[in-house]
């Protein structure tokens, strides 16, 4: 009532990311439902509800953890889905396992009891591990039976201590020139990539069954600095 000149047509909320249980939504749905009823009772009709807070996935075991059916039932329990427009923001849940980043082993270095596998994938290409220590499994693209029981860091070529894909106590016995697959990069991989360190954006390939097409061509060096050099 303090804002009589403002028309409230909808409510939006975001309660976090990687939510793996239904309980947080139960609490916020209850409060939001009460708020909608109060607003509708006092002055006007709420037309839409934007529900945000990313649904959780398990990167280590490659499974979707969130109880989606319970989530849908909960929405129906607290809100009139026939009259209220519901907008959902599932986040990484819909695309996280749709992407694989392929990188090449450039060099291998041994320093004391530590092994470093340097790849051509930098933190500019895939930011999640460097930005907030996001975990992604890495596997070789050719079958390798043995794993080495030595502390190993798989890193990128950028001169930053955070340019690291994974740390492992036991990693595959790969060699220079081998290709590695960084799994589950479909969410926030491409959108976070940049030209940091004057590195051109990598190409992206869309695969559907037995066909493929390039949806983003690899930048040339000239294209990567175009905004800084054009007159």
Which residues are covered by each model-predicted region?
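Active-site loop/helix belt of alpha/beta enzymes
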Residues: 1-108, 199
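Charged (often Lys/Glu-rich) extended helix/loop segments that serve as interaction or gating elements
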Residues: 74, 83-231
């Amino acid at each position: 009532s303090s804002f009589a000149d403002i028309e409230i047509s909808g409510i939006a909320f975001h309660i976090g990311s990687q939510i793996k249980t239904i309980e947080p939504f139960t609490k916020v749905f209850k409060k939001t439902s009460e708020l909608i009823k109060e607003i509708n009772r006092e002055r006007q009709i709420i037309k839409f509800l934007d529900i945000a807070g990313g649904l959780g996935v398990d990167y280590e075991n490659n499974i979707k953890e969130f109880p989606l059916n319970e989530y849908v039932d909960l929405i129906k329990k607290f809100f009139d889905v026939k009259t209220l427009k519901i907008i959902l923001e599932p986040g990484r849940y819909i695309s996280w396992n749709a992407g694989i980043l392929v990188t090449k082993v450039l060099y291998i270095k041994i320093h004391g009891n530590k092994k470093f596998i340097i790849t051509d994938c930098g933190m500019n290409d895939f930011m999640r591990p460097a930005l907030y220590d996001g975990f992604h499994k890495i596997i070789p693209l050719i079958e390798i039976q043995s794993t080495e029981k030595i502390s190993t860091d798989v890193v990128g070529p950028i001169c930053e201590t955070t340019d690291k894909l994974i740390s492992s106590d036991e990693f595959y016995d790969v060699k220079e020139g081998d290709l590695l697959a960084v799994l589950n990069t479909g969410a926030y991989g491409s959108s976070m990539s940049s030209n940091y360190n004057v590195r051109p954006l990598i190409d992206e390939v869309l695969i559907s069954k037995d066909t493929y097409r390039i949806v983003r061509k690899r930048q040339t060096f000239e294209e990567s600095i175009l905004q800084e050099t054009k007159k």
